[in-house]
């Protein structure tokens, strides 16, 4: 039963990743069909992100009322319905309207599943789950490209992805009693965490020492990851003078580094703690950014991108998994939603900000900003580690 339940969570993470890259993959064809401005894709993406941020912030209260199983079911149903709507949308206005439920569904299920896995499973599952998200994010454009290869049938691509999501909805509906049973079996762990006064239970969450630094670390991590993905090709073409097609392949290898790195990290967590992995990942990624900054032969840029991907790989899942350990299981339920909201905020707004600055100056500023983000993350992470050590020491003296 436990194995089947875990398989359902893994499938949910693949499903979570499937829609994330669809708009970018299909937009050149969608733009021509609708006669829309090139930048309209960014507007649609902001609406999706806004829905995701709102539902992430609400996830703590929703989890208490509905539980993880029902949240996952409802969220996947919203996502499936929105994707189906995309496949029939007659105008841009419809796409904008459907973007909101697409974002709302994604944010709730992301926060709910991350909290559940962080609370009830070991660190390797968190790394592998985010690796499976990468599988979904990779499969989405592949499915879409299959329909657009000869006939530009982007609507069929969205329709197919929606059918996959609806299939998951059916599975979740049939297994809803299993979710409730597993949550009841594992609820004693939450009760134990509520008995730990050292976690600052009586404090308002945002006033808890270390929370704001943690949230800023999530903001800069997702901003850095998304910025490299969005502007990496432009940097390689304009600064390193690579052909556009080759630059796209090198950026794909950056994402491959993240996905493969998370798979490997899952095994490493058996021997190495989350905090050491976060620290190591930040140092490796800083080395990657440094290679992009320096006036070295072009192939060093590929090594730099691979190091960025491999370095980024453990940071996000390990920070998520460390949340209950750092702040207590009771507080982590709401804090996980805050972390998701801040993460999506960073991924949504920091890349356009960097793009605007690059337009005013030069895209060669990319690795310098990424290095700055990494340095801040390292400072924030190490500072929170010291705060946690002080808190543990104080609780032991009481």
For every predicted segment, state its role.
Residues 98-132:
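Cytoplasmic helix-loop-helix junction between adjacent transmembrane helices
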